[in-house]
Amino acid sequence: MRLSDQSRQIVQATLPVVGEHIQEIATRFYRHMFDNHPELLDGTFNRGNQVEGTQRQALAGSVAAFATALVNNPDRLPERLLSRIAHKHASLGIRPDQYQVVHDNLMWAIGDVLGDAVTAEVAAAWDEVYWLMAEALINQERGLYSARGVRPETVWRPWQVERKIRETRDVVTFVVKRIDDRLVKTSLPGQYVTVKVPMPDGVHQPRQYSLTAADDGEHRQFSVKRVRGDGKPDGEVSNHLCDRVQVGDTLTMSLPFGDVVLDDWRPAVFASAGIGVTPMAGMLSHLRHAGSGLPITLLHADVDEASFALRHQVLDDVRALPNAAVHVWYESGADSALPVDGVHAGTMDVTAVDLPDGAAYYLCGPLPFMQAVRSALIERGIRPQDIQYEVFGPDLWQADFRTEPAPGSGEDA
């Protein structure tokens, strides 16, 4: 797959104007697509992200980021960008035919916003970009489905809530058990599932949640943080799960997906903030069950100790590992009753702790937190390719083609 030389020149020349109008293009694209295909809001698209605008920014930005990568590196595709999108799509059961729907509405929006600037040649060049990206994603998603022995419509399974655990004021953990005899693909440490929830108006809404405990073949565990609107609408799915779903209820969940998975053959450093601890909890649980003796370091930042979700599970797992250490940072001050190796006040400072040699690094938390920690790690001499990150919701880091490359984009190696 390679962008033609003619299209590459046109895309390079028009990227600035597309970037300048990317938000307007995205807004019109989604409005036009949902007017023509309202069924996509039932079980496929997160309408909360539509209200906030993050999904609009992520999709249009990803296309522009893909185009930028093709212009700058014509002989290679941005595999990390594609892999991240493909795993998310597979967790939603996206079908190949849906790419035509996106194409038609996206190209309409580009023409509608840019008007006469979209000549036949410009339209053809961006059409080529889109289909190069779409075909790469379709191929990756086909491989993901095939590896799990499913089709897009059969990624879903029913699970019954066996336990509901209140972790903090706003975080609830669900332990669910399988209730059918179909093959269940074992998750990899760090992966997530999509939970599809029927809302009061009859529309199903999907959300992704990291698995927070090692798989035993019969149970899965995930944790949900209640999204409080603070003047905006509350998160409809998180509040529904926290308030209405009870032990004995059935949840519809996808098979596990996600491309940020643990390299369990090398030392690991986990850096998380807030609810970003959830994928780290899943990885630590796996390491404990595997009897790992590797050097492991958990760095976690939170408002205070009471806000540290899954803290008892995480610390139990760390104590069971012979070469593990934990450092915490609390905005409220350096006060802790937990058995940790270091308690610090304020925001995370990775220069204040010892880090194991040859480690893989995993980041999860708010985007500014991850960007700051990554920069500090690189300044400390950590190779960019040794740093992975997980982001909740649309990946605005990968989608922002005008700032520094995101980890694994191909430009930071």
Question: Model features per residue range: what roles?
Answer:
Residues P198-G202, L255-V260:
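Short, charged beta-turn/beta-strand-edge "cap" motif at the junction between a beta-strand
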Residues L299-A413:
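Reductase modules of NAD(P)H-dependent flavoproteins
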Residues V150-T250, D302-D304, W329-G333:
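Ferredoxin-reductase
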Residues G190, G276, P366:
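Short, conserved phosphate/pyrophosphate- and ester-handling motifs at nucleotide-, phospho-/glycolipid
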Residues M1-W156:
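Globin-like tetrapyrrole-binding proteins
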Residues V261, V269-H289:
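Phosphate-binding glycine-rich loops and their immediate beta-loop-alpha structural context
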Residues P267-V269, T297, A360:
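Structural motif
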Residues Q208-E218, D263-G274:
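Short, compositionally biased
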